């Protein structure tokens, strides 16, 4: 092999190596910018809902004084059973165990309970697994166990839950009503 041919051969080797490195680099850049999860996998995060329960000065008023009340918050897949249920089922599992278990298994994703006094604020955190939050529309529901149950389902509230990684929901509880702030 002559000296001239060796230089050409070495030049071609360098050129083909350069093309290979350039091709690998280009593929890496394309994968990184295309949102491909192979390189930059984004961790799936659970949703966190911080619930602030706020009691008014007339909370659970019995005619003489305001009284403490138990308040429950739920993240639900469906609110129909919640809206039609007797409140005693939601607060006392032994009242109708079969209905309570059915509600818990079919509708409840997560829940929290607070014992609220007049002019008091309680907070609770509800964590919603990413797998549930990502695949379905969820609803937020709250109910209070009043001394005198109100008419017209004013003791409960339901609304669509936003799909935000972290959010705060304020639930106001009055004499005989529950409302989202």
Regions found by a protein language model. Give the residues of each.
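Bacterial N-terminal signal peptides that target proteins for export
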Residues: 4-23
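C-terminal motif of bacterial Sec signal peptides marking the signal peptidase cleavage site
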Residues: 32-35
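Short amphipathic, basic-aromatic surface patches that mediate peripheral association
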Residues: 51-62, 78
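Glycine-rich, aromatic-bearing surface loops/beta-hairpins
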Residues: 147-181
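Bacterial signal peptide processing site
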Residues: 37-40
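Short, surface-exposed ligand- or partner-binding patches at beta-edge/loop junctions that are enriched
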Residues: 133-150, 154
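Tryptophan-paired
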Residues: 89-134, 148
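Short coil-to-beta strand junction motifs in C2/discoidin
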Residues: 63-70
């Amino acid at each position: 092999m002559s000296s001239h041919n060796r230089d050409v051969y070495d030049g071609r080797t360098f050129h083909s190596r350069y093309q290979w490195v350039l091709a690998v680099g280009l593929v890496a850049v394309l994968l990184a910018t295309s949102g491909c999860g192979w390189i930059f996998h984004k961790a799936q995060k659970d949703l966190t809902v911080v619930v602030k329960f706020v009691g008014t000065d007339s909370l659970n008023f019995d005619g003489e004084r305001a009284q403490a009340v138990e308040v429950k918050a739920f993240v639900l897949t469906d609110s129909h059973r919640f809206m039609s249920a007797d409140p005693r089922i939601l607060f006392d599992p032994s009242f109708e165990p079969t209905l309570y278990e059915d509600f818990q298994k079919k509708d409840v994703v997560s829940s929290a309970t607070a014992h609220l006094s007049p002019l008091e604020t309680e907070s609770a955190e509800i964590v919603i697994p990413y797998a549930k939050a990502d695949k379905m529309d969820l609803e937020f529901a709250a109910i209070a166990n009043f001394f005198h149950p109100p008419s017209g389902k004013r003791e409960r509230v339901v609304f669509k839950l936003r799909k935000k990684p972290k959010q705060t929901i304020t639930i106001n509880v009055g004499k005989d009503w529950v409302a989202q702030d």
